[in-house]
Amino acid sequence: AKETAGELLKKTVADAVETGVVKVGNQEIFVETYEKNPRLVILGGGHVSIPVAEIGKLLGFHITVMDDREDFVTKERFPQADERITGDFETLSEKIPPYENAWYVVVTRGHLGDSACARAILKRPFAYFGMIGSKTKVRITREKLLAEGFTEDQVNSIHAPIGLPIGGQMPAEIAVSIMAEIVQEKNRHFRTYCDEEVEAAIRLGAAGTMVTIMEKKGSS
């Protein structure tokens, strides 16, 4: 069957996002994708979450931290967080909107909120969803989600156990492995991230100059 114009356009756009190139006749046009600044949503305010938030902020993420214990999401504990939310993880869908370009890190206390977080996240769009835990804990959670009706593709989209296998044991080392995996996924396809203020100016039609840095040398 022939592709409709809509289907062809959708495929062309998808190919452009995937490869960074779109073919028009005999010409190739290079495409640069702009997205909103990435949001790092950390579910659980324990020891690992603190360095995850610190590294995430250094990497330019908007930081949201949620925990069911009020004293674990204080400004003193997470000064770098843009949002600090207290609530039962069952209320995640109510407390946290389905942001565009969201990166979820699930590190709940004793894994008690893992399933609730997973249910909510798998029902919304996400750029990344990682969950901490041993292979046994992860397997149990996966089986539970499959039994609840989530597809294998959905469950397999979870990065669990979370992080790159660098053998870290300390909270800071685990945080490095988590954020290293996130950076790896984020850079798998080149994106240019647009600050919210810049995006607002573009929408309002404000004048400006677009500059693309082609090469950096030294400590620039």
Residue ranges of predicted features:
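Segments forming oxygen-rich coordination pockets for charged ligands
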Residues: 1-68, 75-76, 99-103, 185-220
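Short, well-ordered alpha-helical microsegments
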Residues: 49-50, 113-115, 138
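Short amphipathic alpha-helical segments
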Residues: 53-55, 77-78, 97, 116-120, ...
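ADP-ribose/adenylate-binding Rossmann-like module
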Residues: 66, 103-110, 119-144
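Short loop/helix-cap segments at secondary-structure boundaries that form the rim of catalytic
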Residues: 72-82
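Conserved SAM-binding strand-loop segment of SAM-dependent methyltransferases
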Residues: 82-88
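Short amphipathic alpha-helix with an adjacent loop that forms part of the alpha/beta core around
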Residues: 90-100
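Adenosine-phosphate binding glycine-rich loop
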Residues: 132-196
